[in-house]
């Protein structure tokens, strides 16, 4: 028999699309059976007559606290080995991201460490980062590969990411990012490496069921639009969703390229142009903001938020947790950065880590809002108003986190 639970005396920010703003319900109640929400709304509308305790429910009095959906970190590179703190010092001394990458640092530095690590070592090194995000109410996380750059080590990274979801109460969505950078053994042979990605790595990941999506780094220090298009086409051929690191450091028309391949999202987007915005809007894509990388790289060209808003493109926000350009393990701080650096509104930040983040992962039917039929993923907060989650820095007001009803 499935466990039945009720959370009463709560204020809800349901994030439901059918309600204005954050979908606030002041005198709210949530009921769940097993891992699914069966009711979320006004307590007075809940259909019982003799009191929930007499109907086999376990009742939790929330004491007037706020309940939001469990938070979603929809773009991370959380599984890695080694440290790139030395690059932080180099950037402080004036080196650019491109200079570090071209000198053999950056992603390639992490590739060497990941290739040398076992799957168990990757899990052990990644757990503290995952624990930090879980501690801030995250119940769903996307984790990319991209530090193996060959069949064996890309699959090893994906297995480690999946293993994290087996040892912690969290839903892990895995994304293959083999087209992250050119491995050293393919120096000067980018097209040959893309052949490997398309003809061997993507099919292997799909056959093993280790990835639900494929990503690529379309950039001057990554891969050309033509090479990226090949990767996205191969992903589609093997039944995988696609997303894209696009227009972060330059305008290569990455947003429009992602739209042509019906991507779930395009991410970063600092140099996205009007044509890219229009293409993304027409394709119904999500624009994922990653202010952590913008902050660490001390960029000065923010994403075109006003254009995205005018076009009706949904905005998500994520930590981009990675060892070099965004070693950020706080979804709350990511929201603050999005508001401060990009001028995102509180509503955009909160929807961007719930409903719109779910859409960026293709999970909008399962999670991201407090609605009947959705997974019972909740975050319960000691706050007076939801804006505090975006405003405060260094304070974690999480009271309780509920994952799949538990």
Curated annotation (Swiss-Prot):
Binding site for 4-imidazolone-5-propanoate: 84, 147, 180, 248, 325
InterPro entries: Amidohydro-rel, HutI, Metal-dep_hydrolase_composite, Metal_Hydrolase
SUPFAM superfamilies, sorted: Composite domain of metallo-dependent hydrolases (SSF51338), Metallo-dependent hydrolases (SSF51556)
GO MF annotations in UniProt: imidazolonepropionase activity; iron ion binding; zinc ion binding
CDD domains found in the cross-reference section: Imidazolone-5PH
Localization of this protein: Cytoplasm
Main location: cytoplasm
Enzyme class at the top of the EC tree: hydrolase
EC number: 3.5.2.7
Any single Gene Ontology cellular-component annotation: cytoplasm
Highest taxon, organism lineage: Bacteria
UniProt: Fe(3+) binding residues: 75, 77, 245, 320
Protein name: Imidazolonepropionase
Species of origin: Hyphomonas neptunium (strain ATCC 15444)
Lineage of the species this protein comes from: Bacteria, Pseudomonadati, Pseudomonadota, Alphaproteobacteria, Hyphomonadales
């Amino acid at each position: 028999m499935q466990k039945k639970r009720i959370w009463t005396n709560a204020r809800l920010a349901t994030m439901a699309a059918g309600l204005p703003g954050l979908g606030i319900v002041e005198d709210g109640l949530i009921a769940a059976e097993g891992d699914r929400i069966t009711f979320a709304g006004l307590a007075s509308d809940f259909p019982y007559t003799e009191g929930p305790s007499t109907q086999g429910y376990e009742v939790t009095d929330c004491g007037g606290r706020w309940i939001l959906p469990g938070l979603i970190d929809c773009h991370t590179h959380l599984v890695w080995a080694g440290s790139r703190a030395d690059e932080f010092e180099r950037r402080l001394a004036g080196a650019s991201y491109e200079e570090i990458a071209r000198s053999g640092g950056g992603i390639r530095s992490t590739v060497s460490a990941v290739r040398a690590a076992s799957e168990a070592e990757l899990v052990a090194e990644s757990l503290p980062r995952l624990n930090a995000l879980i501690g801030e109410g995250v119940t769903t996380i996307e984790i990319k590969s991209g530090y193996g750059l060959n069949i064996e080590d890309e699959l090893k990274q994906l297995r480690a990411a999946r293993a994290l979801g087996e040892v912690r109460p969290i839903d892990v969505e895995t994304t293959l990012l083999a087209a992250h950078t050119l491995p050293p053994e393919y120096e000067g042979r980018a097209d040959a490496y893309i052949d490997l990605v398309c003809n061997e790595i993507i099919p292997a990941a799909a056959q093993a069921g280790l990835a639900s999506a494929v990503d690529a780094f379309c950039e001057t220090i990554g891969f050309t639009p033509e090479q990226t298009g090949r990767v996205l086409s191969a992903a589609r051929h093997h039944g995988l969703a696609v997303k894209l690191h696009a227009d972060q450091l330059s305008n290569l028309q990455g947003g429009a390229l992602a739209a042509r391949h019906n991507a779930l999202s395009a991410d970063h987007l600092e140099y996205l142009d009007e044509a890219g915005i229009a293409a993304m809007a027409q394709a119904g894509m999500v624009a994922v903001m990653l202010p952590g990388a913008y902050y660490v790289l001390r960029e000065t060209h923010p994403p075109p938020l006003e254009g995205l808003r005018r076009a009706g493109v949904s905005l998500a926000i994520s930590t981009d947790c990675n060892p070099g350009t965004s070693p950020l393990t706080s979804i709350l701080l990511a929201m603050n950065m999005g508001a401060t650096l990009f001028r995102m509104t509180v509503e955009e930040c909160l929807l961007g880590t719930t409903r719109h983040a779910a859409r960026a992962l293709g999970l909008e039917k399962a999670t991201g809002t407090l609605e009947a039929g959705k997974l019972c993923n909740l975050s319960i907060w000691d706050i007076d108003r939801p804006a505090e989650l975006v405003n405060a820095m260094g304070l974690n007001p999480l009271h309780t986190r509920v994952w799949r009803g538990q």
